[in-house]
Amino acid sequence: MSHISVLLFETVESLLADRTTGVYIDATFGRGGHTRLLLSKLDENARVYAFDKDPQALEVAAALAQEDPRFTIIHASFADIKEKMQEIGVQSVDGIMADLGVSSPQLDQAERGFSFMQDGPLDMRMDNSKGLTADEWLLEVEEEDLANIIYQYGEERYSRRIARAIKQAGKLDTTAQLAEIVKTAHPKWEKHKHPATRTFQAIRIAINKELDDIEVFLPQAVDLLKPKGRLSVISFHSLEDRLIKQFIQKESTLAEDSGWGMPQQQVDTRRLKKISRVRASEEEVKANPRSRSAWLRVAERLEQKGA
């Protein structure tokens, strides 16, 4: 299955807010759908930088960089966005977008080891040039830690039973082996959902430190935004969306002064203004069922107080 960019027009339009020039970042290039649309809306003086750590995404991005001199790809995690931009002399930008979903090719190519639907080596690394593979990680992790990860990152109620079965199985080499163990250990299957869905999600998040990276990325993104610059982020499950929601809420709410024994006063430390929260339309969900769980949250950088 080829990759279909989710909330494509909504993301780019919310990012630009009617602008046609400036400096922008796609923090998760993927297969470049959002970046290409963004470039098509910008004038010849604009610049677009993109981040990715997936080797196949980097190949696609390198080809785009050859086609369009306004575009530059950076091989790095978006968790390093501020440092990497400063290294190339970019201190501030007009907009940053991120699509936190795993791309369809990653899910669908058996050799990448993400899929419980197709048998392949148990890998699950976004950047398969470094780090532990899923099979190596499962051998090293303690049963209690694994159960907690499956519960927290997969929101799986039978996490302890599943973790016990995985650890008792010993070395696993393929996604089919892991999926079968989870399937057998799972006492109650959800309608229209493979019983291994939540466990695979949890292991993938843990191996790639996905939630950690999001928590590091968001404040750096705001640091880089110019006043009126936009942050547009697409999430695909409640854990991601909760992080983004809480971050935007915190950055757009007046803080309480400690008061030091005096009556508390509100201190204006706000850096963001909420713009919108958007779901995929019925038409998009029909055309691309993977968009069903997607949420787009958009916020705008406020003017610096006292600047």
UniProtKB/Swiss-Prot annotation:
| Origin species | Acinetobacter baumannii (strain AB0057)
Q: Which family does it belong to?
A: Belongs to the methyltransferase superfamily. RsmH family.
What Pfam families does the record point to? Methyltransf_5 (PF01795)
Q: Does the keyword Metal-binding apply?
A: no
Q: Which UniProt keywords apply?
A: Cytoplasm, Methyltransferase, rRNA processing, S-adenosyl-L-methionine, Transferase
Which example biological process does GO assign this protein?
A: rRNA base methylation
Under the cellular component aspect of Gene Ontology, which terms does the record hold? Answer: cytoplasm
EC number(s) given by UniProt: 2.1.1.199
Q: What is this protein called?
A: Ribosomal RNA small subunit methyltransferase H
Q: Which gene encodes it?
A: rsmH
Q: Name one GO molecular function term.
A: rRNA (cytosine-N4-)-methyltransferase activity
Catalysed conversion reaction: cytidine(1402) in 16S rRNA + S-adenosyl-L-methionine = N(4)-methylcytidine(1402) in 16S rRNA + S-adenosyl-L-homocysteine + H(+)
Cited function: Specifically methylates the N4 position of cytidine in position 1402 (C1402) of 16S rRNA.
Residue positions binding S-adenosyl-L-methionine = 32-34, 52, 78, 99, 106
Q: Which CDD domains does this one have?
A: AdoMet_MTases (cd02440)
Please give the SUPFAM superfamilies that the UniProt record associates with this protein: Putative methyltransferase TM0872, insert domain (SSF81799), S-adenosyl-L-methionine-dependent methyltransferases (SSF53335)
Q: Indicate the enzyme's highest-level EC class.
A: transferase
